[in-house]
């Protein structure tokens, strides 16, 4: 199929979901390009995201749709949705309200390796997860 024919296909038909019906979604800040998180999407969550322009994912642990920010208020307004050349990875460009990470940081990628193989925090703590989600028992 030529690239022009491929572009004429619907976006959803281009996505190659895995055997579990999922596709990885990389989430990037719309203005800075900073990578905020990685999550999984199924067809329903992708359709919802396209329709609402707010990020919705599939929670593998809870086995249900997860509207980002529904508990914390840290919503992701979607500006662009891109697909990679193989059709098996989605890129969402978003405006992040508050922190993207459930442990309170702006990005889930808040730790970096140092030369001595230890780690350091390289991001901003945006909120206290115990205050937002409650204490875990």
Curated annotation (Swiss-Prot):
Residues recorded as binding Mg(2+), renumbered to this chain, are: 84, 86, 88
Reaction(s) catalysed (UniProt annotation): 1-(5-phospho-beta-D-ribosyl)-5'-AMP + H2O = 1-(5-phospho-beta-D-ribosyl)-5-[(5-phospho-beta-D-ribosylamino)methylideneamino]imidazole-4-carboxamide
Query: Is Cytoplasm one of the keywords?
Result: yes
Q: How is the cofactor bound?
A: Binds 1 Mg(2+) ion per subunit.
Which SUPFAM superfamilies does this entry report, sorted A to Z?
HisI-like
Q: What class of enzyme is it?
A: hydrolase
Q: Name one GO cellular component term.
A: cytoplasm
Top-level taxonomic group: Bacteria
Cofactor(s) essential for the protein? Mg(2+); Zn(2+)
The Gene Ontology terms for molecular function here are: magnesium ion binding; phosphoribosyl-AMP cyclohydrolase activity; zinc ion binding
Q: Which InterPro entries match?
A: PRA-CH, PRib_AMP_CycHydrolase_dom, PRib_AMP_CycHydrolase_sf
Q: Where is this chain's protein located in or outside the cell?
A: Cytoplasm
Q: Which GO terms describe its biological process?
A: L-histidine biosynthetic process
EC code? 3.5.4.19
**Residues where Zn(2+) binds:** 85, 101, 108
Q: What does this protein do?
A: Catalyzes the hydrolysis of the adenine ring of phosphoribosyl-AMP.
Q: Which family does the entry's similarity section mention?
A: Belongs to the PRA-CH family.
Q: Which HAMAP family match?
A: HisI
What is the protein's quaternary organization? Homodimer.
Family matches, as PANTHER family? HISTIDINE BIOSYNTHESIS BIFUNCTIONAL PROTEIN, HISTIDINE BIOSYNTHESIS BIFUNCTIONAL PROTEIN HIS7
Name-wise, this protein is Phosphoribosyl-AMP cyclohydrolase
Native source organism of the sequence: Chlorobium limicola (strain DSM 245 / NBRC 103803 / 6330)
